[in-house]
Amino acid sequence: QQLIQAGCKSVHIERFWRNWYSGKPLNRSKVRLPAAAEAILPQMEEYLANQLTAQEKAESETGTRWVLKASDGQLIECVLLPREGVCVSTQVGCAVGCVFCMTGKSGLIRQLTDLEVAGQVQYAMRNAPVKKVVLMGMGEPSHNLRSVFSAVEHIVRYSGIGYKEVVISTVGDKRLFKALMESQIKPALAISLHSAMDEKRRSLLPRAAELTVKEILEFGAKYAEVGKYPIQYQWTLINGVNDGVDEIEALASLWSRQAILNMI
């Protein structure tokens, strides 16, 4: 918005954000900015640099985990994945309270802005090649729809990553499902299922939206048809809880062809 107010045209704005994702300073010899934009550029670059700063880094065989500090001091996690992917957070904390997830122990602290979501992608791209973005870190994307959709649109438009390579991971929510169907951009979708039995699933995801497994899978099949891309279902195996034959039989009775089951 500041660039527009300073007289920038779409070509200036596009080059600015593309350079931001690449970590390169704007080449003023290639794109001549209006004088008003030139004047505010240093403060804009400083503002963006201060949105997220690295606090910790931990490397393992499964990826590189960064703890990033937001401008208000809150901490979030961002993980560089194998095969040029990055997992980003959408909230500080989470309200869902999945029994196997540590993030929900603290509850929801605050929403991330669209710039903070996109900024995690930018931070990863400055440090390694990134071709896929997974919104599967801290937080529940369906509880922060405005920032999530704005960030996804920004990432797709300026980072060079296609919308099919952006995955929104959710426990399932009618508001998100409606927004996805109405959106021109159709990102890939991953749904945290974890059980094919309604009562058991509610015990594992105690504060998830009131949707039956059947309703979730029916939407998944519909979205896969519209988006021309299979839905991913996530299943964290818990010994003696959701790893029995009864789960297999229940899931088989509801399963759609246009789906992938990822067991963790």
Predicted regions and their residues:
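Flexible, acidic/Gly-rich N-terminal and inter-domain linker regions that tether
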Residues: Q1-E84
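Generic beta-structure capping elements
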Residues: S71, L81-R83, Q91-G93, G104, ...
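Residues in well-ordered beta-strands of folded domains
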Residues: Q55, V67-K69, V79, S89, ...
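Conserved AdoMet/S-adenosylmethionine-binding subsite of the radical SAM
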Residues: M125-K132, G137-I264
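Acidic-residue sensor for enzyme active/binding pockets
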Residues: E77, E116, Q120, E140, ...
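Canonical Radical SAM [4Fe-4S] cluster-binding loop centered on the CxxxCxxC motif
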Residues: L81-E116, Y123
